[in-house]
Amino acid sequence: FLVFILMKGLIIWRLQRYSALLIFVYLVYVLSFFVKSQEISFFIWSDFFLSFHMRTLTSIIFIILLFHAFIGLWTVGTDYLTKRTLGFLNQSLIKYADLIRNLYFLCFGLIGFIYLTLILYIIWL
């Protein structure tokens, strides 16, 4: 939970914007491969993505993508899963707001870890 303590407004806002830019640059790089290639076959595509630099770059981008999603989901949880907002929906949810928010954080944390593990396994298989 140290991550939640370190997440301050301007810092996470900037990190999410910079991560979006890096993801965009990666997508432009991959799309430029398609544009520059005269003929794309499975072998050309696999040679491109199985090269060490593309595996490394793709791994880094997926870690950045996961971090980007984590910031977005954390923001949703802290903004909308509070006693005030849940109490607006139903008064009985007020006493469960902290539990609901923590379960939400746990769920997307576990899903993110599983996602990252599977992606890295697939990339480096």
What are the functions of these language-model segments?
Residues 2-125:
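Membrane-embedded alpha-helical bundles that constitute the cytochrome b-like, heme-associated redox core
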